Amino acid sequence: MVRRLTSPRLEFEAAAIYEYPEHLHSFLNDLPTRPGVYLFHGESDTMPLYIGKSVNIRSRVLSHLRTPDEAAMLRQSRRISWICTAGEIGALLLEARLIKEQQPLFNKRLRRNRQLCALQLNEKRVDVVYAKEVDFSRAPNLFGLFANRRAALQALQSIADEQKLCYGLLGLEPLSRGRACFRSALKRCAGACCGKESHEEHALRLRQSLERLRVVCWPWQGAVALKEQHPEMTQYHIIQNWLWLGAVNSLEEATTLIRTPAGFDHDGYKILCKPLLSGNYEITELDPANDQRAS
């Protein structure tokens, strides 16, 4: 049997000769070079084929049109629409919301994860806690965000292996009182289970190892507005407990969006944590009595 290998050069040439679908040409000239979200629509008026985001909508859409692997989606597309935002943060937030709401055929599905959990470090043990039972935006000593209990315990086990922590003391396996664990005999546990290491030293190493996974508590009392600017547009992103409530054009409109979020939004946390805490954006605390304080 003769195997035919496709070289990178041939793949490049295939991409180079790929032509834009004729039926989409009329949409290309109007594509903006601004940040935002774009949608490829098929026959359905309610469910788009694909939703994407970029800091330059035109450039990103044209890169889709040059990719042979996306030919199937492009053949099904009947039109392209877009929504401009003031920057990358707005594009990321809007994309995540629209994908969840509209479930496009060619996007990776983003659904509300009802098994979302974290490791919570208590005085004597580590527990797996769930977002449906604990307010992850306010609860202290949470580490990691995991799709399910199994993933959380696997992460804890990996930390134990790296740091030679005791499975028994972490609750990962049974531990007979007064006896060393099996891993201690193999030099894979530093011996907190049998007195070779103090429980305090063990707990300190555990906390230090978990620190990189810490879930940051919401640092404000209520909602805030993050200001994002573009030469042609200014948006205020209204956020509470790491949940994006929406965007408005002025602070005067902010109170129309303020509400108590239901549950913890994993995607919102991932997108918003760094910019909100970076000090690079103007953040305004939103008071129900309309007393806004910029920081």
UniProtKB/Swiss-Prot annotation:
PROSITE patterns: GIY_YIG (PS50164). SUPFAM superfamilies: GIY-YIG endonuclease. Keywords: DNA damage, DNA excision, DNA repair, Excision nuclease, Hydrolase, SOS response. GO terms for cellular component: excinuclease repair complex. Residues 33-108 form the GIY-YIG domain. CDD domains: GIY-YIG_UvrC_Cho (cd10434). It comes from the Bacteria. Transmembrane segments: none annotated. Gene3D superfamilies: GIY-YIG endonuclease. This is Excinuclease cho. It comes from Shigella flexneri. The lineage of its organism: Bacteria, Pseudomonadati, Pseudomonadota, Gammaproteobacteria, Enterobacterales. The gene is cho.
